[in-house]
Amino acid sequence: MADDKEMPAAVVDGHDQVTGHIISTTIGGKNGEPKQTISYMAERVVGTGSFGIVFQAKCLETGETVAIKKVLQDRRYKNRELQLMRVMDHPNVVCLKHCFFSTTSKDELFLNLVMEYVPESLYRVLKHYSSANQRMPLVYVKLYMYQIFRGLAYIHNVAGVCHRDLKPQNLLVDPLTHQVKICDFGSAKQLVKGEANISYICSRFYRAPELIFGATEYTTSIDIWSAGCVLAELLLGQPLFPGENAVDQLVEIIKVLGTPTREEIRCMNPHYTDFRFPQIKAHPWHKIFHKRMPPEAIDFASRLLQYSPSLRCTALEACAHPFFDELREPNARLPNGRPFPPLFNFKQEVAGSSPELVNKLIPDHIKRQLGLSFLNQSGT
């Protein structure tokens, strides 16, 4: 199918109902090729929210299954999610295939984002394990978290974007290959230093403490906190900080990390001076997880879930953590013996990183393979 991410989006006559309907749209031909008509049969709704709906659809011309996110579009503004998705291209970020606008009988304008279809979410995988009264095997925790951080490294470093709503529902998993893709850029934004942002973003259990403190000049480290919460949830089988409201959310965090110091509060929000918290000691990390939890898993969680945003490791530093060393072993495989999805085909996300970090990220056996391919290319 032709990829028209860069083309202006066509407007088609949509339907008020979704499932069972056929939506036809035209995509522009590239390099002088004729335009193509593409038709989608809407099959079932797979997600709903304040934004609109996501439905599974089949392309009638190719038989390919896609996900279409349909959102109400304000005619006065460009859609930020569309602008961001058009420039992103990474194995751990869901791919935008193309987009079109549709109208309803009430003359409402909807934007339809046509994306690759990934059948499962980390949320549903977690529910599967908890309903079976099981913990997720550690190799899957490592594999999923590594890919999440790799996707974040690309989003943060290359696209310059903060996701701002990282949670298990927005992390898609292919059950056959175990490839993970970050999705839903409806809250995402390119953060500009010195420019204020809203603090009321991110789903509560995964919301960084600086957001609870009302900070407006936060950084991409809010995504690192959210990823730390996801890691803890995969290890525990339940959310680490299950707050019932914004204030209770902070209480849940304090019960684990202890009361933040004045300096930590200043790091989170320099304008927050109302310091009236009960003095609670930090709960040791090793007591939060079960006795057999590997020390590198506990160390990793503690490096992500820090009050001071600047003390949290970056996404690439997270990928290099010893917690993921098992994935870098030469004979590492999925439990069923199949190979892992590609984990080390780094490109833009390592640009500007120190040689030491790149050295840690790329295993020796991969370096040897790359070295051989370079030798072959040079004809020696």
Swiss-Prot record:
Q: Per UniProt, where does ATP bind? A: 46-54, 69
Q: In which tissues is it expressed?
A: In the two outer cell layers of the developing seed coat and restricted to the suspensor cells in developing embryos. Mostly expressed in stomatal lineage cells with asymmetric cell division (ACD) potential. Observed in small cells of non-protruding hypocotyl cell files and of developing cotyledon epidermis.
How activity is controlled: the entry says:
Inactivated by an unknown mechanism after binding of brassinosteroids to the brassinosteroid receptor complex. Inhibited by lithium. Inhibited by dephosphorylation at Tyr-200 by BSU1. Competitive inhibition by KIB1 that reduces substrate (e.g. BZR1) access. Repressed by bikinin.
What topology does it adopt in the membrane?
A: Peripheral membrane protein
Q: What happens when the gene is disrupted?
A: Increased stability of SPCH and formation of excessive stomatal and non-stomatal cell.
Q: Where in the cell is it found?
A: Cytoplasm, Cell cortex; Cytoplasm; Nucleus; Cell membrane
Catalytic residues (UniProt): 165 (proton acceptor)
Cystines in this chain: none
- What Gene3D superfamilies does the database record attribute to this sequence? Phosphorylase Kinase, domain 1, Transferase(Phosphotransferase) domain 1
Any single GO molecular-function term of the entry would be: protein serine kinase activity
Which residue numbers delimit the Protein kinase domain? 40-324
The chemistry this enzyme catalyses reads: L-seryl-[protein] + ATP = O-phospho-L-seryl-[protein] + ADP + H(+); L-threonyl-[protein] + ATP = O-phospho-L-threonyl-[protein] + ADP + H(+)
- EC no. given is 2.7.11.1
The superkingdom of the source organism is: Eukaryota
Q: Any one cellular component term from GO for this entry?
A: plasma membrane
Q: What is its main location?
A: cytoplasm
Any keyword Endoplasmic reticulum? no
Other notes: Unlike other GSK3 kinases, does not require a priming phosphorylation event or the presence of a scaffold protein to phosphorylate its substrates.
Subunit-level organization: Interacts in vitro with the C-terminal fragment of BZR1 and with BES1/BZR2, but not through the kinase domain. Interacts with BHLH150, beet curly top virus AL4/C4 and tomato golden mosaic virus AL4/AC4. Interacts with YDA. Interacts with MKK4. Interacts with KIB1 and KIB2 in a brassinosteroid (BR)-dependent manner. Interacts with BSK1, BSK6, BSK8 and BSK11. Binds to WRKY46, WRKY54 and WRKY70. Component of a complex made of POLAR, BASL, ASK7/BIN2 and ASK3/SK12. Binds to POLAR and BASL.
Q: What is this protein called?
A: Shaggy-related protein kinase eta
Q: What is the lineage of its organism?
A: Eukaryota, Viridiplantae, Streptophyta, Embryophyta, Tracheophyta
Gene encoding this polypeptide?
ASK7
